[in-house]
């Protein structure tokens, strides 16, 4: 029984350490994180809908899911580039990173619209 309570306490300490470290994250990165969570949640919601209703217009389903996943991946790339603590992108300004994000999203959605037919 002591081992279980020790494991629970370790898990709680770990969660508290992660939460306190994330609390120090700048607000703009938290907004990007929220956007990523929303995109992934939307993709999961589309998966559940397809499982319940059926995949009749399968290219539409694939377009929707790939749009959500692609947007989430591009947002993660934006988060990496905008993060001040990241040493690899020190000389890349946030405006340039956002412009890259917008341009890549435009290309992604043009490809997805082409895939729809």
Swiss-Prot record:
Pathway: Protein modification; protein glycosylation. The chain crosses the membrane at residues 34-54, 58-78, 97-117. InterPro entries: DAD/Ost2 (IPR003038). Keywords: Apoptosis, Endoplasmic reticulum, Membrane, Transmembrane, Transmembrane helix. The keyword DNA damage does not apply. Residues 55-57 are lumenal. It is found in: Endoplasmic reticulum membrane. PANTHER family: DOLICHYL-DIPHOSPHOOLIGOSACCHARIDE--PROTEIN GLYCOSYLTRANSFERASE SUBUNIT DAD1. Belongs to the DAD/OST2 family. This is Dolichyl-diphosphooligosaccharide--protein glycosyltransferase subunit DAD1.
């Amino acid at each position: 029984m002591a081992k279980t309570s020790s494991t629970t306490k370790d898990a709680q300490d770990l969660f508290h350490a992660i939460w306190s470290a994330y609390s120090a994250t700048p607000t703009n990165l938290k907004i990007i994180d929220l956007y990523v969570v929303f995109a992934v949640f939307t993709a999961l919601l589309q998966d559940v809908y397809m499982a319940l209703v059926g995949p009749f217009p399968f290219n539409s389903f694939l377009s929707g899911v790939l749009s959500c996943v692609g947007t989430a991946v591009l947002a993660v790339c934006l988060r990496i580039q905008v993060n001040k603590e990241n040493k690899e992108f020190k000389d890349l300004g946030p405006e340039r990173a956002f412009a890259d994000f917008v341009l890549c999203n435009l290309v992604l959605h043009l490809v997805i619209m082409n895939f729809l037919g």
